């Protein structure tokens, strides 16, 4: 009986020790969204370059901020400001592909920061925004599993 209990306990613990894969669009230094301030997309409505001396790390990504206030806002609620789909092009993810981004082609949809490959791709994404967003959300776990680390 003790052996069965020990075996069940060990088997139940295995998922606890399994590492979760991540898939992040980072530069060689581990910086997300090309060093732009993620909070500024929401507060200013445009890309604003962050400063390396004002940085925070969250979920394996380093973010730069243009002000201490933006850094504080991010630190208090990082999930609100970090880009979805690891910072990859949302339209690409909707097509089950990873694509780089043009920082000027960002958009905020349902309170989430989406990055796009280009403004033209953003326009294509928006032609069927709800459907493309649903496809991207459905494809993302598979991309993380197959291409993540």
Tell me what each language-model feature is:
Residues 4-13:
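Sec-dependent N-terminal signal peptides
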Residues 14-18:
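C-terminal segment of classical bacterial N-terminal signal peptides
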Residues 19-149:
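Charged, low-complexity intrinsically disordered segments
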